[in-house]
């Protein structure tokens, strides 16, 4: 029961720090004097880092077990959320948000692993996963409420500090209650290895390409700015190399292509890609009037 409460709270906090930040972003932009061209980065860098490192950190959890990756992710998140509240300029805030983005990449896959190991296949397990998913929108709306309340009644800094306090309490509880599965994982997954070529192509490819697309609209010469062209081309080359590595080189790829073999899986992935992309655009621009 304690494990379930911990992972539900973790899911809630993950969405809390996405939705709520967009609410306080206008006030943060004024307080830290963020130039218009950089206002998108404190909001987007968090999700960018999470998405880029999700697969490598998930593989680390496969090798060393979910317990340590999950709990250390919570500790890391608590630290950098607390630091973000003390930001004195927008560069410090962007760095804190970027480093904090590594934490969801750690506990997103491990929460699924922990729940999967705890419950046997069947209706009860399906219900547990359904409830877990339901806490994402709950955390989303809590983030909006707390973000608005702190910006109006306190200061935007308390949005981060309150979140870090809850994260710290969740860290302590997880250390005391979640069973350590490292020894078990080392035995069960003794043959599992890190796909280093996948890491070296997927991570920089996602980061460089997303940076070029995001920053191109605010660069001095738009998408014709030299550094935008260079980063975009490099990102595409890295992603193309990642497709080749994952499909024909890696013995244990981070993203096996057979994941997309089930009927409609490829179409579902494409539709979710565009759905989340459009939602992110709406969420950002809805914060500014």
Language-model segments: residues:
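Helix-loop-helix hairpins in multi-pass membrane proteins, especially solute transporters
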Residues: 56, 60-197
């Amino acid at each position: 029961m304690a494990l379930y409460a911990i992972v539900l709270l973790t899911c809630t906090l993950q969405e809390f720090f996405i939705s709520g930040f967009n609410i306080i972003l206008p006030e943060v932009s004024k307080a830290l004097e963020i130039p218009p061209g950089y206002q998108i980065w404190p909001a987007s860098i968090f999700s960018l880092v999470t998405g880029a490192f999700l697969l490598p950190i998930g593989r680390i959890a496969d090798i060393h077990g979910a317990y340590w990756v999950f709990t250390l992710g919570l500790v890391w998140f608590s630290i950098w959320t607390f630091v973000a509240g003390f930001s004195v300029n927008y560069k410090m805030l962007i760095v804190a948000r970027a480093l904090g983005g590594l934490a969801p990449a750690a506990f997103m896959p491990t929460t699924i692993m922990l729940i999967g190991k705890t419950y046997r296949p069947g209706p009860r397990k399906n219900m547990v996963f359904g409830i877990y998913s339901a806490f994402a929108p709950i955390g989303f709306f809590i983030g909006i409420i707390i973000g608005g309340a702190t910006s109006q009644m306190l200061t935007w800094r308390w949005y981060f500090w309150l979140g870090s306090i809850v994260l710290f309490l969740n860290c302590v509880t997880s250390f005391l209650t979640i069973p350590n599965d490292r020894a078990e994982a080392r035995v069960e997954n003794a043959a599992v290895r890190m796909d280093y070529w996948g890491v070296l192509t997927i991570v920089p490819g996602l980061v460089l390409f997303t940076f070029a697309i995001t920053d191109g609209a605010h660069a001095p010469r738009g998408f014709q700015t030299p550094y935008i062209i260079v980063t975009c081309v490099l990102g595409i080359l890295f992603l193309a190399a990642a497709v080749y590595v994952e499909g024909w080189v890696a013995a244990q790829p981070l993203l096996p292509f057979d994941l997309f073999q089930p009927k409609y899986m490829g179409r579902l992935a494409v539709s979710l890609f565009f759905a989340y992309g459009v939602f992110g655009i709406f969420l950002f621009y809805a914060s500014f009037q």
